[in-house]
Amino acid sequence: EWDTFAIPPYENMKPFDVLCFQYSLHVETQDGNLKHYNFFESKDCRRHFIEQLIQDLPKTGTILVYNMEGAEKLRLKQLASQFEEYREELDSICSRMVDLSKPFEAGLYYNSKMRGHYSLKSILPVFSKDVSYLDLDIQNGLNAVFAYRTYDDKDEEEKKEVKKAISTYCQMDTYAEYIVYHGLIEEVKNNA
């Protein structure tokens, strides 16, 4: 999961290209331990973003993403075209992605708590009563992008607060994916 900045302010970016400035990863090991990785930078951080993402992601295994075609996969392909030297590694990452939204989008799983929607925020309450976006300072991607757009205009203390709020929101997204994934596994076990 990462949030994006829609105005292309840097060299080698086209109109309406998106600047990836933040990501959050939760990596689950085979023994069930969960480790969180976070990246956040301002300015032109594309190269460092790519390098850190490649370093933080395990070299093998499935990468679960939610609604990946219009966001994560598209952005990585865009970065691969801007930085050819990373194309092979970014293409490899894309090839390991699996879209966690598909069972919900296809109607293979439905719960009335979803209220006819299948966004991550709509399905999280189905699988957890305790984890919620409602307590966060930033509760959606648009607010995260707006906060980022004003980031460089802030003083150092405000920057820390904005960075923490954006990072916490994005961390919630990837943790929610973890909860939903394990919730689906339990549903299959209990209803098989």
Where does each model-flagged region fall?
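Short, well-ordered loop/turn elements at secondary-structure boundaries
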Residues: 19-21, 57-60, 171
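Metal-dependent catalytic core segments for phosphate chemistry
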Residues: 1-49
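Short amphipathic alpha-helical segments
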Residues: 9-10, 76-78, 182
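Conserved DEDDh/DEDDy metal-dependent 3′-5′ exonuclease domain
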Residues: 27-29, 35-142
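Acidic, Mg2+-coordinating catalytic module of metal-dependent nucleases/exonucleases
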Residues: 123-192
